[in-house]
Amino acid sequence: MLKCKQPGARFIHGAVHLPSGQIVFHTIHSPTLASALGLPGENVPIPALFRASGLNVRESLPMTNMRAPIISLARLILAPNPYILEGQLTVGMTQDNGIPVLFARPVIEVKSGPESNIKASSQLMIAEDSCLNQIAPFSASEHPAFSMVESVKRVRVDEGANTRRTIRDILEIPVTVLSSLQLSPTKSILKKAPEPPPPEPQATFDAAPYARIFYDIGRQVPKLGNAPAAQVSNVLIANRSHNSLRLVPNPDLLPLQHLYLKHVVLKSLNLENIVQDFEAIFTSPSDTISEAETKAFEKLVEQAKNTVENIVFCLNSICSTSTLPDVVPDVNNPNISLALEKYFLMFPPSGTIMRNVRFATPIVRLLCQGAELGTMAQFLGKYIKVKKETGMYTLVKLYYLLRI
Protein backbone atom coordinates (compact mmCIF):
# COMPACT_ATOMS: atom_id res chain seq x y z
CA MET A 1 0.00 0.00 0.00
CA LEU A 2 1.05 3.59 -0.62
CA LYS A 3 0.21 6.37 1.83
CA CYS A 4 0.28 9.96 0.58
CA LYS A 5 1.02 12.43 3.39
CA GLN A 6 1.11 15.51 1.18
CA PRO A 7 -1.49 18.02 2.45
CA GLY A 8 -4.36 18.47 0.04
CA ALA A 9 -4.03 15.08 -1.67
CA ARG A 10 -7.35 13.31 -2.15
CA PHE A 11 -9.17 10.64 -4.14
CA ILE A 12 -11.17 11.70 -7.20
CA HIS A 13 -12.56 9.12 -9.66
CA GLY A 14 -10.26 6.35 -8.47
CA ALA A 15 -7.02 8.37 -8.56
CA VAL A 16 -5.00 10.26 -5.96
CA HIS A 17 -4.89 13.92 -7.02
CA LEU A 18 -1.90 15.86 -5.74
CA PRO A 19 -1.87 19.65 -5.15
CA SER A 20 0.72 19.93 -7.94
CA GLY A 21 -1.87 18.70 -10.45
CA GLN A 22 -0.30 15.26 -10.86
CA ILE A 23 -2.45 12.17 -10.34
CA VAL A 24 -1.46 8.63 -9.33
CA PHE A 25 -3.69 5.79 -10.45
CA HIS A 26 -3.85 2.16 -11.62
CA THR A 27 -4.04 0.97 -15.19
CA ILE A 28 -5.75 -2.35 -15.95
CA HIS A 29 -4.65 -4.58 -18.81
CA SER A 30 -7.83 -5.56 -20.66
CA PRO A 31 -8.14 -5.29 -24.46
CA THR A 32 -11.90 -5.89 -24.24
CA LEU A 33 -12.53 -3.16 -21.68
CA ALA A 34 -10.24 -0.72 -23.51
CA SER A 35 -12.17 -1.29 -26.72
CA ALA A 36 -15.50 -0.86 -24.91
CA LEU A 37 -14.37 2.51 -23.53
CA GLY A 38 -13.05 3.60 -26.92
CA LEU A 39 -9.45 3.75 -25.69
CA PRO A 40 -6.43 3.00 -27.87
CA GLY A 41 -4.22 0.08 -26.91
CA GLU A 42 -4.94 -2.59 -24.33
CA ASN A 43 -4.70 -0.68 -21.03
CA VAL A 44 -7.50 1.09 -19.16
CA PRO A 45 -6.75 3.91 -16.71
CA ILE A 46 -8.96 3.47 -13.66
CA PRO A 47 -10.15 7.13 -13.81
CA ALA A 48 -11.54 6.49 -17.31
CA LEU A 49 -13.65 3.60 -15.99
CA PHE A 50 -14.84 5.58 -12.96
CA ARG A 51 -15.86 8.52 -15.17
CA ALA A 52 -17.70 6.22 -17.58
CA SER A 53 -20.03 5.23 -14.73
CA GLY A 54 -21.41 8.76 -14.52
CA LEU A 55 -21.17 8.57 -10.73
CA ASN A 56 -19.42 11.03 -8.45
CA VAL A 57 -17.25 8.44 -6.70
CA ARG A 58 -13.87 8.60 -5.03
CA GLU A 59 -12.06 5.35 -4.22
CA SER A 60 -14.83 2.78 -4.76
CA LEU A 61 -17.05 2.12 -7.78
CA PRO A 62 -20.27 0.04 -7.51
CA MET A 63 -20.09 -2.74 -10.10
CA THR A 64 -23.79 -2.57 -11.00
CA ASN A 65 -25.28 0.51 -12.65
CA MET A 66 -28.48 0.34 -14.71
CA ARG A 67 -27.64 3.67 -16.37
CA ALA A 68 -24.15 2.58 -17.40
CA PRO A 69 -24.11 -0.96 -18.90
CA ILE A 70 -20.34 -0.62 -19.38
CA ILE A 71 -20.00 -1.21 -15.62
CA SER A 72 -21.70 -4.59 -15.90
CA LEU A 73 -19.27 -5.46 -18.68
CA ALA A 74 -16.38 -4.39 -16.44
CA ARG A 75 -17.72 -6.64 -13.66
CA LEU A 76 -17.76 -9.64 -16.00
CA ILE A 77 -14.15 -8.95 -16.97
CA LEU A 78 -12.61 -7.98 -13.64
CA ALA A 79 -14.49 -9.73 -10.83
CA PRO A 80 -13.41 -13.26 -9.82
CA ASN A 81 -17.09 -13.91 -9.02
CA PRO A 82 -18.82 -11.66 -11.57
CA TYR A 83 -22.33 -12.81 -10.69
CA ILE A 84 -22.23 -11.26 -7.22
CA LEU A 85 -23.91 -7.99 -8.11
CA GLU A 86 -23.37 -5.99 -4.92
CA GLY A 87 -19.58 -5.87 -5.32
CA GLN A 88 -17.56 -2.71 -5.76
CA LEU A 89 -14.19 -1.97 -7.35
CA THR A 90 -11.95 -0.36 -4.73
CA VAL A 91 -8.53 1.18 -5.37
CA GLY A 92 -7.75 2.53 -1.90
CA MET A 93 -9.13 4.12 1.23
CA THR A 94 -9.16 7.49 2.96
CA GLN A 95 -8.15 7.45 6.61
CA ASP A 96 -10.05 9.39 9.28
CA ASN A 97 -7.36 12.09 9.17
CA GLY A 98 -7.96 12.58 5.43
CA ILE A 99 -4.80 10.81 4.24
CA PRO A 100 -5.39 8.75 1.07
CA VAL A 101 -3.97 5.22 0.94
CA LEU A 102 -3.60 3.59 -2.48
CA PHE A 103 -3.70 -0.20 -2.72
CA ALA A 104 -0.98 -2.07 -4.59
CA ARG A 105 -3.73 -3.60 -6.77
CA PRO A 106 -7.42 -2.81 -7.22
CA VAL A 107 -9.71 -5.19 -5.34
CA ILE A 108 -13.32 -6.31 -5.56
CA GLU A 109 -15.14 -5.91 -2.24
CA VAL A 110 -18.41 -7.71 -1.55
CA LYS A 111 -20.70 -7.52 1.46
CA SER A 112 -21.15 -11.26 1.66
CA GLY A 113 -17.50 -12.30 1.67
CA PRO A 114 -13.83 -11.33 1.66
CA GLU A 115 -12.28 -8.98 -0.86
CA SER A 116 -10.28 -10.34 -3.78
CA ASN A 117 -7.87 -8.98 -6.37
CA ILE A 118 -9.21 -8.26 -9.84
CA LYS A 119 -8.55 -10.91 -12.49
CA ALA A 120 -6.69 -8.57 -14.85
CA SER A 121 -3.11 -7.44 -14.27
CA SER A 122 -2.57 -3.83 -13.20
CA GLN A 123 0.18 -1.26 -12.75
CA LEU A 124 0.55 1.99 -10.84
CA MET A 125 1.06 5.02 -13.08
CA ILE A 126 1.47 8.78 -12.70
CA ALA A 127 0.23 11.50 -15.04
CA GLU A 128 1.01 15.19 -15.15
CA ASP A 129 -2.66 16.24 -15.11
CA SER A 130 -6.20 14.89 -14.96
CA CYS A 131 -6.29 14.63 -18.77
CA LEU A 132 -3.82 11.74 -18.35
CA ASN A 133 -1.06 13.43 -20.31
CA GLN A 134 2.56 12.23 -20.06
CA ILE A 135 1.77 8.94 -18.33
CA ALA A 136 4.71 7.07 -16.80
CA PRO A 137 5.16 4.15 -14.38
CA PHE A 138 4.99 5.29 -10.77
CA SER A 139 7.92 4.82 -8.40
CA ALA A 140 7.53 5.72 -4.73
CA SER A 141 11.28 6.30 -4.39
CA GLU A 142 11.00 9.24 -6.79
CA HIS A 143 8.08 10.83 -4.94
CA PRO A 144 8.84 11.52 -1.27
CA ALA A 145 5.21 12.46 -0.59
CA PHE A 146 4.39 8.74 -0.78
CA SER A 147 5.53 6.15 1.74
CA MET A 148 5.12 2.39 1.82
CA VAL A 149 2.66 0.91 4.30
CA GLU A 150 2.92 -2.80 4.93
CA SER A 151 -0.60 -3.14 6.33
CA VAL A 152 -3.49 -0.97 7.40
CA LYS A 153 -6.03 -2.06 9.97
CA ARG A 154 -9.42 -2.24 8.26
CA VAL A 155 -12.33 -2.97 10.58
CA ARG A 156 -15.69 -3.96 9.14
CA VAL A 157 -18.65 -2.69 11.20
CA ASP A 158 -21.44 -5.16 11.91
CA GLU A 159 -24.58 -3.01 11.62
CA GLY A 160 -26.63 -5.91 12.93
CA ALA A 161 -25.01 -5.33 16.31
CA ASN A 162 -26.97 -2.07 16.63
CA THR A 163 -30.23 -4.01 16.85
CA ARG A 164 -29.22 -6.00 19.95
CA ARG A 165 -31.39 -5.28 22.99
CA THR A 166 -30.03 -7.36 25.86
CA ILE A 167 -26.68 -7.45 27.58
CA ARG A 168 -26.48 -11.20 26.94
CA ASP A 169 -26.83 -10.66 23.19
CA ILE A 170 -24.25 -7.89 23.22
CA LEU A 171 -21.74 -10.10 24.98
CA GLU A 172 -22.08 -12.62 22.17
CA ILE A 173 -20.87 -10.12 19.56
CA PRO A 174 -17.20 -10.77 18.72
CA VAL A 175 -14.83 -8.05 19.84
CA THR A 176 -13.13 -7.97 16.46
CA VAL A 177 -13.86 -9.25 13.01
CA LEU A 178 -10.32 -8.88 11.78
CA SER A 179 -9.88 -12.65 11.69
CA SER A 180 -12.57 -12.87 9.00
CA LEU A 181 -10.94 -10.30 6.75
CA GLN A 182 -8.41 -10.97 4.04
CA LEU A 183 -6.04 -8.03 4.22
CA SER A 184 -4.19 -6.86 1.15
CA PRO A 185 -0.79 -8.44 0.44
CA THR A 186 1.92 -7.16 2.76
CA LYS A 187 4.81 -7.40 0.33
CA SER A 188 6.13 -4.09 -0.91
CA ILE A 189 5.14 -3.38 -4.50
CA LEU A 190 8.64 -1.96 -5.01
CA LYS A 191 10.15 -5.38 -4.32
CA LYS A 192 7.58 -7.24 -6.34
CA ALA A 193 8.82 -8.67 -9.60
CA PRO A 194 7.16 -7.09 -12.64
CA GLU A 195 4.25 -9.09 -13.96
CA PRO A 196 4.99 -10.93 -17.19
CA PRO A 197 3.54 -9.35 -20.32
CA PRO A 198 0.36 -10.95 -21.66
CA PRO A 199 0.93 -13.62 -24.29
CA GLU A 200 0.79 -12.52 -27.90
CA PRO A 201 -2.37 -13.66 -29.70
CA GLN A 202 -1.83 -16.71 -31.84
CA ALA A 203 -1.94 -16.32 -35.60
CA THR A 204 -4.25 -19.33 -35.84
CA PHE A 205 -6.26 -20.75 -32.97
CA ASP A 206 -6.17 -24.50 -32.41
CA ALA A 207 -9.49 -25.61 -30.92
CA ALA A 208 -8.54 -29.29 -30.74
CA PRO A 209 -7.12 -29.21 -27.16
CA TYR A 210 -10.52 -28.04 -25.90
CA ALA A 211 -12.58 -30.79 -27.51
CA ARG A 212 -12.30 -33.27 -24.62
CA ILE A 213 -14.07 -30.96 -22.17
CA PHE A 214 -16.87 -30.37 -24.69
CA TYR A 215 -17.69 -34.09 -24.78
CA ASP A 216 -17.19 -34.45 -21.02
CA ILE A 217 -19.93 -31.85 -20.53
CA GLY A 218 -22.27 -34.08 -22.50
CA ARG A 219 -21.58 -36.99 -20.13
CA GLN A 220 -21.83 -35.28 -16.75
CA VAL A 221 -23.32 -32.19 -15.16
CA PRO A 222 -21.07 -30.26 -12.76
CA LYS A 223 -22.35 -30.26 -9.20
CA LEU A 224 -21.26 -28.48 -6.06
CA GLY A 225 -19.20 -30.86 -3.97
CA ASN A 226 -17.69 -32.70 -6.92
CA ALA A 227 -15.49 -29.82 -8.13
CA PRO A 228 -14.11 -26.44 -6.92
CA ALA A 229 -17.09 -24.48 -5.61
CA ALA A 230 -16.19 -21.08 -7.08
CA GLN A 231 -15.67 -22.46 -10.59
CA VAL A 232 -18.84 -24.57 -10.48
CA SER A 233 -20.84 -21.57 -9.27
CA ASN A 234 -19.46 -19.35 -12.05
CA VAL A 235 -20.26 -21.90 -14.75
CA LEU A 236 -23.76 -22.72 -13.50
CA ILE A 237 -24.73 -19.06 -13.07
CA ALA A 238 -23.32 -18.19 -16.49
CA ASN A 239 -25.34 -21.04 -17.96
CA ARG A 240 -28.55 -19.63 -16.49
CA SER A 241 -27.97 -15.91 -16.93
CA HIS A 242 -25.52 -15.42 -19.80
CA ASN A 243 -26.41 -18.10 -22.32
CA SER A 244 -29.32 -16.60 -24.25
CA LEU A 245 -28.15 -17.24 -27.82
CA ARG A 246 -27.77 -20.70 -29.35
CA LEU A 247 -25.25 -20.04 -32.10
CA VAL A 248 -25.30 -23.52 -33.67
CA PRO A 249 -28.54 -25.22 -34.81
CA ASN A 250 -27.86 -28.57 -33.16
CA PRO A 251 -30.77 -29.67 -30.93
CA ASP A 252 -28.69 -32.46 -29.39
CA LEU A 253 -26.29 -30.06 -27.65
CA LEU A 254 -26.82 -29.26 -23.98
CA PRO A 255 -27.09 -25.59 -22.95
CA LEU A 256 -23.80 -25.98 -21.07
CA GLN A 257 -22.12 -27.18 -24.27
CA HIS A 258 -23.42 -24.09 -26.07
CA LEU A 259 -21.94 -21.97 -23.27
CA TYR A 260 -18.59 -23.74 -23.55
CA LEU A 261 -18.52 -23.24 -27.33
CA LYS A 262 -19.01 -19.51 -26.88
CA HIS A 263 -16.19 -19.24 -24.36
CA VAL A 264 -13.84 -21.18 -26.61
CA VAL A 265 -14.70 -18.62 -29.31
CA LEU A 266 -13.87 -15.86 -26.82
CA LYS A 267 -10.53 -17.53 -26.14
CA SER A 268 -9.83 -17.74 -29.86
CA LEU A 269 -10.38 -13.97 -30.05
CA ASN A 270 -8.02 -13.42 -27.10
CA LEU A 271 -10.89 -12.00 -25.04
CA GLU A 272 -11.74 -12.68 -21.40
CA ASN A 273 -13.48 -16.02 -20.87
CA ILE A 274 -14.19 -18.75 -18.30
CA VAL A 275 -12.58 -21.66 -20.14
CA GLN A 276 -10.24 -22.04 -17.16
CA ASP A 277 -13.28 -22.64 -14.94
CA PHE A 278 -14.40 -25.49 -17.20
CA GLU A 279 -10.86 -26.90 -17.10
CA ALA A 280 -10.90 -26.84 -13.28
CA ILE A 281 -14.20 -28.75 -13.22
CA PHE A 282 -13.69 -31.35 -15.94
CA THR A 283 -10.34 -32.87 -15.00
CA SER A 284 -10.32 -36.23 -16.80
CA PRO A 285 -7.30 -36.15 -19.14
CA SER A 286 -7.46 -39.93 -19.45
CA ASP A 287 -10.65 -39.68 -21.52
CA THR A 288 -9.77 -39.98 -25.18
CA ILE A 289 -11.79 -38.76 -28.13
CA SER A 290 -11.59 -39.77 -31.75
CA GLU A 291 -10.22 -37.65 -34.56
CA ALA A 292 -13.73 -37.40 -36.01
CA GLU A 293 -15.03 -35.99 -32.71
CA THR A 294 -12.21 -33.45 -32.64
CA LYS A 295 -12.96 -32.35 -36.20
CA ALA A 296 -16.67 -32.07 -35.36
CA PHE A 297 -15.87 -29.86 -32.37
CA GLU A 298 -13.58 -27.62 -34.42
CA LYS A 299 -16.37 -27.23 -36.97
CA LEU A 300 -18.83 -26.23 -34.24
CA VAL A 301 -16.42 -23.61 -32.89
CA GLU A 302 -15.94 -22.16 -36.37
CA GLN A 303 -19.69 -22.18 -36.97
CA ALA A 304 -20.39 -20.38 -33.68
CA LYS A 305 -17.75 -17.77 -34.48
CA ASN A 306 -19.14 -17.15 -37.97
CA THR A 307 -22.68 -16.86 -36.62
CA VAL A 308 -21.84 -14.25 -33.99
CA GLU A 309 -19.83 -12.25 -36.54
CA ASN A 310 -22.80 -12.34 -38.93
CA ILE A 311 -25.11 -11.17 -36.16
CA VAL A 312 -22.88 -8.18 -35.41
CA PHE A 313 -22.77 -7.31 -39.13
CA CYS A 314 -26.58 -7.29 -39.38
CA LEU A 315 -27.08 -5.46 -36.09
CA ASN A 316 -24.72 -2.70 -37.24
CA SER A 317 -27.07 -1.95 -40.14
CA ILE A 318 -30.17 -2.19 -37.95
CA CYS A 319 -28.70 0.13 -35.29
CA SER A 320 -27.78 2.81 -37.84
CA THR A 321 -31.33 3.00 -39.25
CA SER A 322 -33.44 5.65 -37.55
CA THR A 323 -36.80 4.42 -38.88
CA LEU A 324 -37.42 0.68 -39.02
CA PRO A 325 -40.52 -1.11 -40.28
CA ASP A 326 -42.74 -2.07 -37.36
CA VAL A 327 -43.12 -5.83 -37.06
CA VAL A 328 -45.14 -8.13 -34.83
CA PRO A 329 -43.18 -9.16 -31.70
CA ASP A 330 -41.70 -12.67 -31.83
CA VAL A 331 -43.25 -14.15 -28.70
CA ASN A 332 -41.73 -17.58 -29.39
CA ASN A 333 -38.13 -16.48 -28.76
CA PRO A 334 -38.08 -14.45 -25.53
CA ASN A 335 -34.43 -15.33 -24.88
CA ILE A 336 -33.33 -13.69 -28.13
CA SER A 337 -35.52 -10.64 -27.49
CA LEU A 338 -34.09 -10.21 -23.99
CA ALA A 339 -30.52 -10.63 -25.26
CA LEU A 340 -31.09 -7.98 -27.93
CA GLU A 341 -32.63 -5.61 -25.41
CA LYS A 342 -29.45 -5.88 -23.33
CA TYR A 343 -27.35 -5.44 -26.47
CA PHE A 344 -29.15 -2.26 -27.55
CA LEU A 345 -28.80 -0.83 -24.04
CA MET A 346 -25.05 -1.30 -24.38
CA PHE A 347 -24.91 -0.06 -27.99
CA PRO A 348 -27.84 2.37 -28.39
CA PRO A 349 -29.51 2.34 -31.83
CA SER A 350 -30.64 5.37 -33.81
CA GLY A 351 -34.30 4.47 -33.27
CA THR A 352 -36.22 3.23 -30.26
CA ILE A 353 -34.85 0.16 -28.50
CA MET A 354 -38.03 -1.92 -28.54
CA ARG A 355 -38.67 -1.30 -32.25
CA ASN A 356 -35.09 -2.44 -32.92
CA VAL A 357 -35.63 -5.51 -30.74
CA ARG A 358 -38.80 -6.49 -32.62
CA PHE A 359 -37.15 -6.03 -36.01
CA ALA A 360 -33.87 -7.75 -35.12
CA THR A 361 -35.22 -10.79 -33.24
CA PRO A 362 -36.31 -12.81 -36.32
CA ILE A 363 -33.08 -11.84 -38.11
CA VAL A 364 -30.94 -13.17 -35.26
CA ARG A 365 -33.13 -16.27 -34.96
CA LEU A 366 -32.60 -17.13 -38.64
CA LEU A 367 -28.84 -16.56 -38.37
CA CYS A 368 -28.67 -18.85 -35.33
CA GLN A 369 -30.56 -21.47 -37.33
CA GLY A 370 -27.85 -21.42 -40.00
CA ALA A 371 -29.05 -18.80 -42.51
CA GLU A 372 -26.31 -17.52 -44.82
CA LEU A 373 -25.11 -13.96 -44.36
CA GLY A 374 -25.56 -13.18 -48.05
CA THR A 375 -29.20 -14.24 -47.93
CA MET A 376 -29.88 -12.16 -44.82
CA ALA A 377 -28.08 -9.13 -46.28
CA GLN A 378 -30.28 -9.30 -49.38
CA PHE A 379 -33.38 -9.55 -47.19
CA LEU A 380 -32.30 -6.58 -45.04
CA GLY A 381 -31.55 -4.57 -48.19
CA LYS A 382 -35.25 -4.55 -49.03
CA TYR A 383 -36.05 -2.57 -45.88
CA ILE A 384 -32.92 -0.74 -44.72
CA LYS A 385 -29.52 0.36 -45.97
CA VAL A 386 -26.94 -2.37 -45.37
CA LYS A 387 -23.65 -1.09 -43.97
CA LYS A 388 -20.59 -2.79 -45.40
CA GLU A 389 -18.22 -1.22 -42.87
CA THR A 390 -17.71 -3.04 -39.59
CA GLY A 391 -17.79 0.17 -37.54
CA MET A 392 -16.39 0.74 -34.06
CA TYR A 393 -16.16 -1.64 -31.13
CA THR A 394 -16.48 -4.82 -33.20
CA LEU A 395 -14.53 -6.91 -30.68
CA VAL A 396 -16.54 -5.61 -27.77
CA LYS A 397 -19.80 -6.30 -29.61
CA LEU A 398 -18.67 -9.87 -30.23
CA TYR A 399 -17.72 -10.19 -26.58
CA TYR A 400 -21.06 -8.82 -25.39
CA LEU A 401 -23.13 -11.11 -27.62
CA LEU A 402 -21.13 -14.10 -26.45
CA ARG A 403 -21.71 -13.17 -22.80
CA ILE A 404 -25.44 -12.37 -22.78
From Swiss-Prot:
Pfam families in alphabetical order: Herpes_BTRF1
Organism domain of life: Viruses
Protein family membership: Belongs to the lymphocryptovirus BTRF1 family.
Protein name: Uncharacterized protein BTRF1
Organism per entry: Epstein-Barr virus (strain AG876) (HHV-4)
